[in-house]
Protein backbone atom coordinates (compact mmCIF):
# COMPACT_ATOMS: atom_id res chain seq x y z
CA UNK A 1 0.00 0.00 0.00
CA UNK A 2 1.31 3.46 -0.82
CA UNK A 3 2.59 5.38 2.17
CA UNK A 4 -0.04 7.55 3.80
CA UNK A 5 -2.98 5.52 2.49
CA UNK A 6 -5.28 3.95 5.02
CA UNK A 7 -8.42 1.93 4.80
CA UNK A 8 -11.50 3.62 6.26
CA UNK A 9 -11.97 3.06 9.98
CA UNK A 10 -14.96 0.96 10.99
CA UNK A 11 -16.37 -2.50 11.16
CA UNK A 12 -17.27 -4.70 8.22
CA UNK A 13 -20.85 -3.48 8.74
CA UNK A 14 -19.84 -0.11 7.29
CA UNK A 15 -20.18 -1.57 3.78
CA UNK A 16 -23.00 0.54 2.35
CA UNK A 17 -24.86 -2.11 0.35
CA UNK A 18 -28.30 -0.52 0.57
CA UNK A 19 -26.96 2.84 -0.57
CA UNK A 20 -25.56 1.36 -3.78
CA UNK A 21 -28.01 -1.36 -4.86
CA UNK A 22 -29.91 -0.28 -7.95
CA UNK A 23 -27.70 2.78 -8.41
CA UNK A 24 -25.42 3.55 -11.34
CA UNK A 25 -21.82 2.51 -10.84
CA UNK A 26 -19.99 5.81 -10.25
CA UNK A 27 -17.46 7.44 -12.52
CA UNK A 28 -13.91 6.24 -11.95
CA UNK A 29 -10.45 6.15 -13.47
CA UNK A 30 -7.96 3.49 -12.33
CA UNK A 31 -5.00 1.63 -13.85
CA UNK A 32 -4.66 -2.12 -13.93
CA UNK A 33 -1.36 -3.95 -13.42
CA UNK A 34 -0.78 -3.89 -17.20
CA UNK A 35 -1.08 -0.05 -17.13
CA UNK A 36 -4.41 0.00 -18.94
CA UNK A 37 -6.65 2.84 -17.78
CA UNK A 38 -10.18 1.79 -16.84
CA UNK A 39 -13.17 4.13 -16.61
CA UNK A 40 -16.92 3.73 -16.20
CA UNK A 41 -17.27 3.87 -20.00
CA UNK A 42 -15.28 0.61 -20.23
CA UNK A 43 -17.86 -1.33 -18.22
CA UNK A 44 -20.98 -0.18 -20.07
CA UNK A 45 -22.39 -2.70 -22.54
CA UNK A 46 -21.49 -5.88 -20.67
CA UNK A 47 -21.89 -7.11 -17.10
CA UNK A 48 -19.02 -6.62 -14.66
CA UNK A 49 -17.79 -8.42 -11.56
CA UNK A 50 -15.68 -6.31 -9.18
CA UNK A 51 -13.93 -8.32 -6.46
CA UNK A 52 -12.21 -6.75 -3.43
CA UNK A 53 -9.39 -8.84 -2.00
CA UNK A 54 -5.90 -8.72 -0.53
CA UNK A 55 -2.98 -11.12 -0.48
CA UNK A 56 -3.24 -11.98 3.24
CA UNK A 57 -6.94 -12.90 3.04
CA UNK A 58 -7.44 -16.66 3.29
CA UNK A 59 -11.14 -16.57 2.30
CA UNK A 60 -10.23 -14.40 -0.71
CA UNK A 61 -7.74 -16.98 -1.91
CA UNK A 62 -10.14 -19.87 -1.28
CA UNK A 63 -12.81 -18.34 -3.54
CA UNK A 64 -10.42 -17.64 -6.44
CA UNK A 65 -10.94 -21.00 -8.20
CA UNK A 66 -14.72 -20.44 -8.17
CA UNK A 67 -14.32 -16.90 -9.49
CA UNK A 68 -12.03 -18.20 -12.25
CA UNK A 69 -14.74 -20.72 -13.22
CA UNK A 70 -17.15 -17.81 -13.71
CA UNK A 71 -14.73 -16.46 -16.32
CA UNK A 72 -14.90 -19.75 -18.22
CA UNK A 73 -18.68 -19.99 -17.88
CA UNK A 74 -19.42 -16.33 -18.73
CA UNK A 75 -16.69 -15.05 -21.06
CA UNK A 76 -18.60 -11.90 -22.10
CA UNK A 77 -18.35 -10.33 -18.65
CA UNK A 78 -15.70 -7.87 -17.45
CA UNK A 79 -13.83 -9.19 -14.39
CA UNK A 80 -11.91 -6.70 -12.24
CA UNK A 81 -10.20 -7.36 -8.91
CA UNK A 82 -9.04 -4.51 -6.70
CA UNK A 83 -6.58 -4.57 -3.83
CA UNK A 84 -4.40 -2.23 -1.83
CA UNK A 85 -1.49 -4.64 -2.32
CA UNK A 86 1.28 -3.94 -4.83
CA UNK A 87 1.54 -5.57 -8.25
CA UNK A 88 4.58 -7.52 -7.00
CA UNK A 89 2.60 -8.88 -4.04
CA UNK A 90 -0.25 -9.89 -6.34
CA UNK A 91 2.15 -11.64 -8.71
CA UNK A 92 3.58 -13.79 -5.90
CA UNK A 93 0.10 -14.90 -4.82
CA UNK A 94 -1.34 -15.60 -8.28
CA UNK A 95 1.66 -17.79 -9.07
CA UNK A 96 0.54 -20.02 -6.16
CA UNK A 97 -3.22 -19.59 -6.58
CA UNK A 98 -4.15 -18.43 -10.08
CA UNK A 99 -6.61 -15.52 -10.13
CA UNK A 100 -7.31 -14.49 -13.71
CA UNK A 101 -9.32 -11.33 -13.07
CA UNK A 102 -7.85 -8.06 -14.35
CA UNK A 103 -5.92 -6.77 -11.33
CA UNK A 104 -6.07 -3.21 -10.02
CA UNK A 105 -3.18 -2.95 -7.56
CA UNK A 106 -2.25 -0.45 -4.87
CA UNK A 107 -5.57 1.35 -5.20
CA UNK A 108 -8.04 2.52 -2.56
CA UNK A 109 -10.57 4.38 -4.71
CA UNK A 110 -13.15 1.56 -4.73
CA UNK A 111 -12.43 0.62 -1.09
CA UNK A 112 -13.19 4.15 0.08
CA UNK A 113 -16.17 4.56 -2.22
CA UNK A 114 -17.93 1.42 -0.97
CA UNK A 115 -16.48 1.68 2.57
CA UNK A 116 -14.99 -1.81 2.33
CA UNK A 117 -13.09 -2.89 5.43
CA UNK A 118 -13.63 -6.65 5.38
CA UNK A 119 -12.93 -8.98 2.50
CA UNK A 120 -13.70 -10.54 0.17
CA UNK A 121 -16.46 -8.31 -1.22
CA UNK A 122 -17.98 -8.86 -4.65
CA UNK A 123 -20.06 -6.38 -6.66
CA UNK A 124 -22.12 -7.37 -9.71
CA UNK A 125 -22.98 -4.67 -12.24
CA UNK A 126 -25.35 -5.09 -15.19
CA UNK A 127 -24.63 -4.06 -18.78
CA UNK A 128 -26.20 -0.64 -18.23
CA UNK A 129 -23.78 0.05 -15.38
CA UNK A 130 -26.33 -0.45 -12.59
CA UNK A 131 -25.20 -2.12 -9.37
CA UNK A 132 -27.28 -5.27 -8.96
CA UNK A 133 -25.61 -7.08 -6.05
CA UNK A 134 -23.01 -6.48 -3.35
CA UNK A 135 -21.92 -9.15 -0.90
CA UNK A 136 -19.18 -9.49 1.66
CA UNK A 137 -17.63 -12.73 2.79
CA UNK A 138 -17.55 -16.00 0.92
CA UNK A 139 -19.00 -19.46 1.03
CA UNK A 140 -20.73 -21.99 -1.18
CA UNK A 141 -24.19 -20.40 -0.84
CA UNK A 142 -22.92 -16.90 -1.73
CA UNK A 143 -20.91 -18.15 -4.70
CA UNK A 144 -23.82 -20.27 -5.97
CA UNK A 145 -26.28 -17.35 -5.66
CA UNK A 146 -23.90 -14.92 -7.32
CA UNK A 147 -23.13 -17.41 -10.09
CA UNK A 148 -26.86 -17.76 -10.76
CA UNK A 149 -27.31 -13.98 -10.80
CA UNK A 150 -24.32 -13.59 -13.10
CA UNK A 151 -25.87 -16.19 -15.43
CA UNK A 152 -29.05 -14.08 -15.55
CA UNK A 153 -27.07 -10.89 -16.20
CA UNK A 154 -25.09 -12.57 -18.99
CA UNK A 155 -28.29 -14.01 -20.53
CA UNK A 156 -29.99 -10.62 -20.20
CA UNK A 157 -27.21 -9.17 -22.30
CA UNK A 158 -27.64 -11.74 -25.05
CA UNK A 159 -31.44 -11.63 -24.93
CA UNK A 160 -31.60 -7.84 -25.11
CA UNK A 161 -29.05 -7.77 -27.91
CA UNK A 162 -31.26 -10.12 -29.93
CA UNK A 163 -34.32 -7.96 -29.15
CA UNK A 164 -32.45 -4.83 -30.21
CA UNK A 165 -31.60 -6.47 -33.55
CA UNK A 166 -35.23 -7.56 -34.02
CA UNK A 167 -36.62 -4.08 -33.31
CA UNK A 168 -34.07 -2.45 -35.64
CA UNK A 169 -35.02 -4.92 -38.39
CA UNK A 170 -38.73 -4.22 -37.83
CA UNK A 171 -38.13 -0.47 -38.15
CA UNK A 172 -36.19 -0.95 -41.39
CA UNK A 173 -38.91 -3.15 -42.86
CA UNK A 174 -41.75 -0.77 -41.90
Segments (PLM) and residue ranges:
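N-terminal "domain-start" segment that seeds a small globular fold
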Residues: 4-40
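Conserved redox-active cysteine motifs that mediate thiol-disulfide chemistry
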Residues: 52-69
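Thiol-/selenol-based redox modules, centered on thioredoxin-like
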Residues: 7-19, 124-174
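Short, internal strand/loop/helix patches
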Residues: 80, 94-128
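Acidic helix N-cap motif at the loop->helix transition within catalytic regions
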Residues: 89-92
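Short pre-active-site segment immediately N-terminal to redox-active cysteine/selenocysteine motifs
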Residues: 46-48, 53-56, 86, 118
